Swiss-Prot record:
Biased composition (Polar residues): 97-107, 459-469
InterPro entries linked: GLI-like, Znf-C2H2_ZIC1-5/GLI1-3-like, Znf_C2H2_sf, Znf_C2H2_type, Znf_ZIC
PROSITE patterns: ZINC_FINGER_C2H2_1 (PS00028), ZINC_FINGER_C2H2_2 (PS50157)
Species assigned in the record: Xenopus laevis
Record's subcellular location: Nucleus; Cytoplasm
A GO cellular component annotation in the UniProt record: cytoplasm
Cited Pfam families: zf-C2H2, zf-C2H2_15, zf_ZIC
Protein name per its UniProtKB record: Zinc finger protein ZIC 2-B
Region annotation (Disordered) ranges: 58-107, 143-180, 423-473
Renumbered zinc finger spans (C2H2-type): 273-308, 317-344, 350-374, 380-404, 410-432
Gene: zic2-b
The family this protein is said to belong to: Belongs to the GLI C2H2-type zinc-finger protein family.
């Protein structure tokens, strides 16, 4: 039985061998040449399978074919070949009609295995295994030069930067996908066109006018999930890809290079911390501050400790910071002065150790109290008999103790209630505003004011104004009471709402 070598080796000139069986006596030499070429091609494919960029499971679907398109096979229609009609594009037929293909589908490869990758095509820019294996730096440069119909190996052409990853569909007779790639899954991000591109290059904004290629190491779109490969190549190429994906679509949830720039900007920008300590022994009048600048808080604190605060030999612990509110009042101990200076410098050397909190404190006592919010510890119990309330710090307990004592200096003039804080009294006054009848009949209200005038007219600026009065009435009463005549208008009904 004779071999049908037409779909397999059209580049060898044997494409018409199986189509013309009445001339088979004239082609025995071609059969031998085809067998030798098949062995050589198999060796090339095996060497290609060892390439780190290609999965070995895909190698059955590829073969090197620098010649024209092949005829239709069981794996799907190829291109428009010499003897094969124009059929539907095969799963890995990577060449548009009329162009040479670097990879064509094998006739015997099952179509079901190729279906997941049927939407991806690559550039017809690799005409030999050497071009495919060792053309490492360009990636998509060949496709950009060849024209819009060709596609890059790892990056889409310039006209297909915004191709949507979900628009994969079944391709028909002359239709070619735009922006599809040969090896998906390297990085599931879009590369967007940038206004800073110039001749295929991106200005990185770094010293020395460093430029990076935008079409090199371009990020690709793919529905495949290959986290190991994506993470490996991202860590390898992301330093060369800074800022190239700033205009990526918002529905992608990947880490963008902007975070890297923000981190580097925070590390590179120097802070100017100025020492405002005024040396009391200087003879200048007015006295000038130190005004030394430092780039880190550690340098400023070290300078303050060595040059100004001094060691244990200092007997007077006075803060001489410019415009200090203490105005030369000394501290009893050096550590109190050190804690006070942090108010001026902004130093907060005590961070919260709990993960995700991020709070920092200037004093260790405040950190100790704060950590109780994480642990739930409440060591301070109410000292009133019968009360089991507990608190995280003593100040909260002290405020609570006013509930049990008579120390409530803020009295309500509308009733007999008293409060420990003026904010509580203001909140209570809203109750009287919502119930005007109760406020008029309150005994405290009648006893606190003259009977001839309403309670709200005695002190217009107080918080216990009559709620029945409109704002216009209050202003009118204020003007009348502050006038020289001291008489009130006779018609009060005009002031009520």
């Amino acid at each position: 039985m004779l071999l049908d070598a037409g779909p397999q080796f059209p580049a060898l000139g044997v494409g018409t061998f199986a189509r013309h069986h009445h001339h088979h006596h004239h082609h025995h030499a071609a059969v031998a040449a085809a067998a030798a070429a098949a062995a050589e091609m198999q060796e090339r494919e095996l060497s290609l399978a060892q390439n780190s960029f290609v999965e070995p499971t895909h190698m059955g679907a590829f073969k090197m074919n620098p010649g024209g398109g092949s005829g239709g096979g069981s794996g799907g229609g190829g291109g428009a070949g010499p003897n094969g009609g124009a059929g539907a594009s095969g799963p890995h037929d990577l060449s548009p009609p009329g162009q040479t293909s670097a990879f064509t589908s094998q006739a015997g490869y099952p179509a079901s295995a190729l279906a997941p990758h049927s939407a991806y095509t690559g550039a017809a820019a690799f005409n030999s295994p050497r071009d495919f294996l060792f053309r490492g730096r360009g990636f998509a440069e060949g496709s950009a030069a060849a024209g819009g119909g060709q596609h890059g190996l790892f990056g889409p052409p310039a006209g297909s930067l915004h191709h949507h990853p979900h628009h994969h569909h079944q391709l028909s007779h002359g239709e070619h996908p735009q922006g599809h790639l040969l090896f998906p899954g390297i990085h599931d991000q879009h590369a967007a066109a940038s206004q800073n591109t110039l001749g295929g290059q991106m200005r990185l904004g770094l010293p020395g006018e460093v430029f990076g290629r935008t079409d090199q190491y371009r990020q690709v779109s793919s529905p495949r999930g290959d986290p190991y490969t994506a993470a490996q190549l991202h860590n390898q190429y992301s330093p060369m890809n800074m800022g190239m994906n700033m205009a990526a679509h918002h529905h992608h949830h990947h880490h963008h290079p902007g975070a890297f720039f923000r981190y580097m900007r925070q590390q590179c920008i120097k802070q100017e911390l100025i020492c405002k300590w005024i040396d009391p022994e200087q003879l200048n009048n007015p006295k000038k501050s130190c005004n030394k600048t430092f780039s880190t808080m550690h340098e400023l604190v070290t300078h303050m400790s060595v040059e100004h605060v001094g060691g244990p030999e200092q007997s007077n612990h006075i803060c001489f910071w410019e415009e200090c509110a203490r105005e030369g009042k000394p501290f009893k101990a050096k550590y109190k002065l050190v804690n006070h200076i942090r108010v001026h410098t902004g130093e907060k050397p005590f961070p919260c150790p709990f993960p995700g909190c991020g709070k920092v404190f200037a004093r260790s006592e405040n950190l100790k109290i704060h950590k109780r919010t994480h642990t739930g510890e409440k060591p301070f119990q109410c000292e009133f008999e019968g009360c089991d309330r507990r608190f995280a710090n003593s100040s909260d307990r002290k405020k609570h103790m006013h509930v049990h004592t008579s120390d409530k200096p803020y009295l309500c003039k509308m009733c007999d209630k008293s409060y420990t804080h003026p904010s509580s009294l203001r909140k209570h006054m809203k109750v009287h505003e919502s119930s005007p009848q109760g406020s008029e009949s309150s005994p405290a209200a009648s006893s606190g004011y003259e009977s001839s005038t309403p309670p709200g007219l005695v002190s217009p600026n107080s918080e216990t104004q009559n709620p029945n009065l409109s704002p216009a009435a209050v202003s009118a009463v204020h003007s009348v009471s502050s006038g020289a005549s001291g008489t009130l208008a006779s018609n009060f009904n005009e002031w009520y709402v």
